[in-house]
């Protein structure tokens, strides 16, 4: 039954209010919605505060190490015990003993050892009181029976507080998918984690994508141990694909994963093709087989640099696989350690490997232990030893190598000077002739003595190189007469000429290359290794800077020689000579002099002559008193340059010598104009400085 609106009883306190509401609410539009809709539309209004009030406050991120400032051991132990009581979990006595032994809390502590302790979720949560106050180099969580919850909590703590650089989580078989997910997040976010040991911790199909993504995007890991982690199949495929883009991982250990010779080995071969930063690959105790070795060799062949250590111990390899490896070794440039132990290679396999080893120049360590070798195989190995200039260690233990093989190895060591360690069985092998046993003992001793001899030779060579480097790193500056530049220096040049020295400075080879780093270093090193000489005697067929003085003027009272050895670039000796007057010389002895007037002084005077001839004195103008610009005479034509200038200035010198003394005097002005027009400003300034000083000395 409907009640008319006018008969409805009014509510308490609503006299007039209920009637006024519809009067105030309506808006003036004729097509307006009902009254309830109009009320709701009017209530929705949005306003924004002013720019000054739009940000009400700011919160800085929490410092993870805010609890580690000025902390003491007692505070750490007290906080840990309080957390254990709060979480109702047992305390770890092994942890408490280690905490009491810590002294230097301001730096990373060497190790936190929790190996063998059972860590459930609550126990792991209590460890946060330690991790928030201390950082460690090594955190050992091996065989701690971690479950998914405990592992996730621990890995989150280690990531947040950067608690460790080396983390061992091996032998934890129940960390599960969430545990591996937290571990992957830790690997990706932690910049200090360099080493992760996850041996015997299964990385299954549903967990591998997290780890692969962490290694592909960004990771600071340099060493990763995944032995016995059930990687064969899809996990290895994901891991190898991710590592193709990884440039930080240096060592990868994949032993005991039952890797096969088809899909798994193909993935590893592709990894080696694209990854040049991986240095150690350990594949021991797998099923690579000869077919898998072919894939790996294909990847190695395409590497120009990269893998340095390859361990193929116990992979059922035979002589067929050694043929693949023998063809690959000549193309490898970085492989230094190759371990083929416990594979039935046999004598034929070593023969297949021999030529590749001889052609290779990078292998330093070779492992052939327990490879079914006999004396025949030892002879092939001896041939490689005799030809190898770099081999350092060779392992031939657990092989049937008897007298004949030992004799071949002994003879090879007599011509080899690099092998430092040759591992053989200590006990001699049984022989039909009893006297051969004594022969084996003598040969074993001889082989050992040969290795000791090589060791002594290597040590002596290293000490000699160190002494040479030490002597080369000491700068030497030798001044023939330690006087100021303003004073005349007559004695050094006079003594040099009295002793018959051809000139006080080196020839063009050492002078023109003084500013270059890459030329004539070997020659300079050889000269310096013999004896550090203050001055170098130039060759008779070259002209040195000391021969630039005019023949008409004695060079002894105006020359100053300073020899400086520079150990930085080739250890060369540079000689700077200051001359009294502008240089002038006859033609060099290499091109034959054209026929001219018969006059002994007109020919090129030997550089050893200390005094000028009368004709030379007549043909050369006297410098006289010092003038502002005396270098009006042309510089000498030839490789040497004045005052050790750069070799680029040689382009400004005239290539043809004057035919005689008359032409020499007549062409002085022309040669000077050509040289001054082509030389740079530095040449003019240096010549001006030299002439001014020489003028002061003549006064």
Curated annotation (Swiss-Prot):
Family that this chain belongs to: Belongs to the PPP1R37 family.
A molecular function GO annotation: protein phosphatase inhibitor activity
Biased composition (Pro residues): 1-12, 588-613, 622-642
This protein's encoding gene: PPP1R37
Repeat region (LRR), residues: 220-240, 248-269, 277-297, 306-326, 334-354
Listed InterPro entries: Leu-rich_rpt, LRR_dom_sf, PP1-Reg/Actin-Interact_Protein
Record note on quaternary structure: Interacts with PPP1CA.
Positions with biased composition (Acidic residues): 510-525
CDD domains given in the database record: LRR_RI
Transmembrane segments: none
Cross-referenced Gene3D superfamilies: Ribonuclease Inhibitor
Sorted UniProt keywords: Leucine-rich repeat, Phosphoprotein, Protein phosphatase inhibitor, Repeat
Source species of the chain: Bos taurus
Modified residues (Phosphoserine): 50, 56, 566
SMART domains for this protein: LRR_RI
Disordered: annotated segments: 1-42, 467-667
Annotated function: Inhibits phosphatase activity of protein phosphatase 1 (PP1) complexes.
Signal sequence annotation: none
Name of this chain's protein: Protein phosphatase 1 regulatory subunit 37
């Amino acid at each position: 039954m409907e009640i008319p609106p006018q008969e409805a009883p009014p509510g308490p306190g609503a006299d007039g209010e209920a009637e006024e509401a519809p009067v105030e609410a309506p808006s003036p539009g004729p097509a307006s919605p009902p009254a309830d809709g109009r009320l709701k539309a009017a209530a929705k209004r949005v306003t924004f505060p002013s720019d000054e009030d739009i940000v009400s406050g700011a919160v800085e991120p929490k410092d993870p190490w805010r609890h580690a400032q000025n902390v003491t051991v007692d505070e750490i132990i007290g906080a840990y015990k309080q957390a254990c009581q709060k979480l109702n979990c047992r305390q770890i006595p092994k942890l408490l003993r280690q905490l009491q032994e810590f002294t230097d809390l301001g730096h990373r502590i060497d190790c936190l050892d929790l190996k063998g302790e059972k860590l459930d979720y609550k126990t792991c949560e209590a460890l946060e009181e330690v991790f928030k106050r201390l950082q460690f180099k090594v955190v050992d969580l091996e065989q701690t029976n971690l479950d998914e919850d405990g592992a996730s909590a621990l890995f989150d703590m280690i990531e947040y507080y950067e608690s460790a650089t080396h983390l061992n989580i091996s032998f934890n078989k129940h960390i599960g998918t969430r545990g591996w997910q937290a571990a992957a997040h830790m690997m990706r976010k932690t910049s200090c984690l360099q080493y992760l040991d996850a041996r015997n911790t299964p990385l299954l199909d549903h967990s591998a994508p997290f780890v692969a993504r962490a290694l592909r995007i960004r990771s600071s890991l340099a060493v990763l141990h995944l032995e016995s982690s059930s990687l064969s199949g899809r996990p290895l495929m994901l891991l190898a694909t991710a590592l193709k883009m990884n440039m930080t991982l240096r060592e990868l250990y994949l032993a005991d994963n039952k890797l096969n010779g088809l899909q798994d080995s193909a993935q590893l071969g592709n990894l080696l093709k694209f990854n040049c930063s991986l240095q150690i690959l350990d594949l021991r105790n797998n099923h690579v087989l000869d077919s898998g070795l072919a894939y790996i060799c294909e990847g190695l062949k395409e590497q120009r640099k990269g893998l340095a250590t390859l361990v193929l111990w116990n992979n059922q390899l035979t002589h067929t696989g050694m043929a693949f490896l023998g063809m690959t070794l000549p193309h490898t440039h970085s492989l230094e350690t190759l371990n083929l132990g416990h594979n039935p290679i046999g004598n034929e396999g070593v023969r297949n490997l021999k030529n590749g080893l001889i052609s290779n120049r990078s292998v330093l360590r070779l492992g052939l232990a327990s490879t079914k070798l006999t004396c025949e195989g030892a002879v092939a190995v001896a041939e490689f030893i005799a030809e190898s200039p770099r081999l350092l260690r060779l392992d031939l233990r657990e092989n049937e190598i008897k007298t004949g093989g030992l004799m071949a190895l002994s003879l090879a060591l007599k011509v080899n000077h690099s092998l430092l360690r040759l591992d053989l069985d200590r006990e001699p092998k049984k022989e039909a002739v009893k006297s051969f046993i004594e022969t084996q003992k003598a040969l074993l001793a001889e082989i050992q003595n040969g290795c000791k001899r090589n060791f002594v030779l290597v040590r002596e060579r290293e000490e000699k190189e160190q002494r040479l480097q030490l002597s080369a790193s000491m700068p030497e500056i030798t001044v023939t007469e330690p006087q100021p530049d303003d004073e005349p220096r007559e004695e050094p040049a006079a003594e040099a000429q009295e002793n018959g020295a051809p000139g006080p400075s080196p020839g063009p080879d050492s002078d023109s290359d003084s500013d270059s780093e890459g030329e004539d270093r070997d020659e300079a090193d050889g000269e310096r290794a013999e004896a550090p000489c203050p001055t170098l005697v130039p060759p008779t067929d070259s002209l040195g800077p000391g021969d630039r003085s005019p023949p008409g003027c004695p060079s002894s009272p105006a020359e100053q020689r300073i020899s400086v050895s520079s150990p930085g670039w080739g250890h060369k000796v540079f000689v700077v000579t200051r001359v009294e007057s502008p240089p002038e010389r006859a033609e060099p002895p290499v091109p034959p002099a054209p026929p001219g007037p018969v006059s002994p002084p007109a020919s090129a005077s030997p550089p050893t002559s200390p005094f000028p001839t009368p004709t030379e004195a007549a043909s050369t103008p006297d410098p006289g008193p010092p003038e502002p610009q005396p270098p009006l005479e042309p510089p000498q034509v030839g490789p040497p340059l004045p005052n050790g200038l750069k070799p680029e200035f040689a382009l400004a010198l005239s290539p043809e010598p004057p035919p005689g003394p008359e032409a020499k005097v007549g062409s002085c002005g022309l040669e000077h104009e050509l040289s001054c027009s082509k030389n740079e400003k530095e040449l003019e300034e240096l010549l001006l400085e030299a002439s001014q000083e020489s003028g002061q000395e003549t006064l």
